[in-house]
UniProtKB/Swiss-Prot annotation:
PROSITE patterns attached to this UniProt entry: DNA_MISMATCH_REPAIR_1
Protein name: DNA mismatch repair protein MutL
The keyword Ribonucleoprotein appears for this protein: no
Region (Disordered): 389-423
NCBIfam families: mutl, PRK00095.1-1
Gene3D superfamilies noted in UniProt: 3.30.230.10, Histidine kinase-like ATPase, C-terminal domain, MutL, C-terminal domain, regulatory subdomain
Any one GO BP annotation for this protein: mismatch repair
Length: 631
């Protein structure tokens, strides 16, 4: 067979094999033409999934009469004039193949009118008959394209079409994609005479979120994180899935480059890497729009324009990664601050929450010890630690880099930072030995309300060096460690509450830990035990979400403590004594002042009070006093 130039109709049908895959492909090409023409409204009508009829109506600029026939010719376009234009293309179409290819496999009617024309004109082409007839018609400014009987002259192609429902699904999915990136356009879709989609123009962020909810679901729109980043000619905007969302957000994954939906492995890798700590191995939902200089991206690398090539791919990858990581960090900080504000506001309305974080200040003045340098000789209460526990655990588990602030909470312990808590002191008794003046003091109460509440309690022993109670037993003095007393008071409290079940306290921010394959079964088998301890644990998207814990675990590193606990109870159900010991060990000390510790001790039954007080160690005070006097 000799080499020859193909007839135009045959060449168009071959090209249609690339351009026209199914009805959704026709709609894509025609709607993109409408958008390139500046339309602000596009109405789509289809019958039988698009195989019977596809009709696109827009209010764009229209096509002049003398160009109607040319519009249906192959390689005819208004988008390009030179190779330089191709390097900086911003329009959807530019090859001039769509209308010619569609008209070669359907009965196509193109009706259009420009603002300058007094009447509209209509062009008609059918299958292999490439001659185009142009006649007058009635039509407002804009264009209407009808493609009837798709693949009527290529039975083999028609047999490959799926059911009407399947073809409609493909059309609907494509419309969702374009509706998100061109939110200023009013889109409607009718199927078999019934309107099924109506995407109204979105000119504000609130309106865009409504469209986002229409397309991607309310769960994603309500929990999505806003992304908006600009740097050195690159701009990334849109929404990403919140790593703390508890609801399924679907499989929304749309990425646009200069308004064009693309599928790119580089982009997907950057998104997965940004979420590596939060949702390991899971699909991430996102709607992201990247804008950059069109000279820096090549869109002419795929027949359907689904792929692009970035001239500086590594730079684009790093920009996307850093923009998403920044959005995740900022959202974590805002979530923490909002949760903290809520907790402070609700502190007097919910007994199930611990008291809010607060910074204590020293109160010197009239309550200073009148011996030597008061600032150096005054006795301070036991050290306190800032409430970093749960925040640090959440930060390590979720990859958040929240700027820590110096705030104090209850108790002292070994994890997290340690701070110094200052409280006012009262003058010692005049009858006290002078050598005790620098060592002993009774902590003052921070408010009149506390004084009223504690007025019925027996007098608290004096505090020695901020670490011990000094107890008098007849002619003997005994020292009781405040940390030891705090642990024992906590132990008795847990023992009293555990049988009825502990009350879980919501965390400021849920802690997420990568799940182990055996945890699901463990949670099912030990459900009653987990509830009894006040724990609320759920498994979602390959992550264990820690939502509530008893107050005794608030200061622990939950990201490691809870997995160790699940591993412990996996093979055996612990005894009550073992659970109590575990909670006590994890709790640290739940008191930030000797006065509160004393109030807690006095709230126990008298027998338990005596058990704890009996732990004090006798101090040979006569020997100690003799040593001090001899000096």
């Amino acid at each position: 067979m000799t080499i020859r130039i193909l007839p135009p109709q045959l060449a168009n049908q071959i090209a249609a094999g690339e351009v026209v895959e199914r009805p959704a492909s026709v709609i894509k090409e025609l709607v993109e033409n409408s958008l390139d023409a500046g339309a602000t409204r596009v109405d789509i009508e289809i019958d039988k999934g698009g195989s019977k009829l596809i009709k696109i109506t827009d209010n764009g600029s229209g096509i002049p009469k003398e160009e109607l026939s040319l519009a249906l010719s192959r390689h005819a376009t208004s988008k390009l004039a030179s190779l330089d234009d191709l390097d900086a293309i911003l329009s959807f179409g530019f090859r001039g193949e769509a209308l010619a290819s569609i008209s070669s496999v359907s009965r196509l009617t193109l009706t259009s009118r420009t603002q300058e024309q007094s009447e509209a004109w209509q062009a008609y082409a059918e299958g292999s008959e490439m001659a185009v007839r142009v006649i007058p018609a009635a039509h407002p400014v804009g264009s209407t394209v009808e493609a009837a009987d798709l693949f009527f002259n290529t039975p083999a192609r028609r047999r490959f079409l799926k059911s009407d429902k399947t073809e409609f699904t493909h059309i609907d999915e494509w419309l969702k994609r374009i509706a998100l990136v061109r939110s200023e356009i009013h889109f409607t879709l009718k199927h078999n005479g019934k309107q099924v989609r109506n995407y109204r123009p979105a000119k504000t962020e609130a309106q865009y979120l409504q469209r986002l909810a229409q397309v991607s679901g309310k769960a994603f729109a309500d929990n999505a994180l806003r992304v908006d980043c600009n740097h050195n000619g690159l701009s990334l905007s849109g929404y990403i899935q919140s790593p703390f969302s508890e609801m399924a957000v679907g499989d929304t994954q749309y990425f646009y480059v200069n308004g064009r939906l693309v599928r790119d492995r580089l982009v997907n890798h950057a998104v997965r890497q940004a979420f590596a700590q939060q949702l390991q191995g899971e699909q991430v939902a996102f709607v992201l729009m990247l804008n950059l200089d069109p000279h820096q991206v090549d869109v002419n690398v795929h027949p359907a324009k689904h792929e692009v090539r970035f001239h500086e791919s590594r730079y684009v990858h790093d920009f996307i990664l850093q923009a998403l990581e920044s959005a995740l960090r900022q959202s974590s900080e805002l979530a923490f601050e909002a949760a903290l504000d809520t907790q402070v506001t609700d502190q007097n309305r919910s007994a199930s929450y611990i008291r809010p974080l607060q910074t204590q200040q020293s109160d010197t003045g009239s309550n200073q010890i009148a011996h030597g340098d008061t600032e150096e000789n005054a006795l301070w209460l036991a050290n306190e630690r800032p409430a970093y526990g749960e925040r640090e655990a959440s930060r390590q588990a979720g990859g958040q880099r929240v700027q820590e602030t110096q705030m104090s909470s209850y108790g002292s312990g070994q994890s997290g930072g340690r701070g110094r808590s200052y409280a006012s002191t009262e003058l010692p008794s005049q009858a006290a030995v002078d050598s005790y003046a620098q060592l002993m003091t009774t902590p003052g109460v921070s408010s009149q309300a506390n004084q009223a509440d504690d007025s019925h309690l027996p007098p608290m022993p004096q505090v020695l060096d901020g670490q011990y109670w000094l107890l008098v037993r007849g002619s003997e003095l005994a020292l009781l460690s405040l940390s030891c007393a705090a642990r024992e008071v906590t132990r008795r409290e847990i023992e009293a509450k555990l049988d009825a079940g502990l009350i879980g306290q919501p965390l400021l921010m849920p802690v997420s830990v990568k799940v182990d394959e055996d945890w699901q079964q463990t949670l099912v088998e030990r459900e009653l035990l987990v509830r009894k301890l006040g724990l609320e644990l759920t498994i979602r998207l390959g992550q264990l979400i820690i939502k509530k814990v008893p107050p005794y675990l608030r200061q622990s590193q939950l990201a490691s403590v809870i997995p160790e606990f699940l591993q412990w109870i996996r093979f055996e159900e612990p005894t009550t004594e073992a659970l109590v010991n575990w909670l006590v060990n994890q709790s640290g000390e739940q008191f930030n002042s000797a006065s509160r510790l004393w109030a807690g001790l006095m709230g126990l039954p008298e027998s338990q009070q005596q058990e704890i007080l009996s732990l004090a160690k006798v101090m040979p005070w006569q020997t100690w006093l003799g040593e001090q006097t001899s000096e």
